Amino acid sequence: MSITAERKQALIKEYATKEGDTGSPEVQVAVLSERIANLTEHFKGHKNDNHSRRGLLKLVSQRRRLLDYVKGVDHARYQALITRLGLRR
């Protein structure tokens, strides 16, 4: 259900803008997207898990806010990020 430390480190390395970057919006969105994908898979087998569904909605909202921030700061960076992650919008 949660992502492994190795997978998280791989995402950080892939989306980091510089060495040691763990807090940039790109990294945060990538990690959130991975967690959202894992929870979405969880719901295929556990349709009535409403406590986790609330957590999923919270993660989706947090990702949306980060994406809106990136879009406001640099639209080209936003387009590149959603293309790399395969997100709609």
Swiss-Prot record:
**Xref: Pfam families:** Ribosomal_S15 (PF00312)
Q: Which HAMAP family match?
A: Ribosomal_uS15_B (MF_01343_B)
Keyword Ribonucleoprotein belongs to the record: yes
The family note in this entry says: Belongs to the universal ribosomal protein uS15 family.
Name the CDD domains on file: Ribosomal_S15p_S13e
What residue stretch is flagged as signal peptide?
A: none
GO MF entries? rRNA binding; structural constituent of ribosome
An annotated GO cellular component of this protein is: cytosolic small ribosomal subunit
Q: Listed disulfide bonds for this chain?
A: none
Q: Which InterPro entries match?
A: Ribosomal_uS15 (IPR000589), Ribosomal_uS15_bac-type (IPR005290), uS15_NS1_RNA-bd_sf (IPR009068)
Name of the protein this chain belongs to? Small ribosomal subunit protein uS15
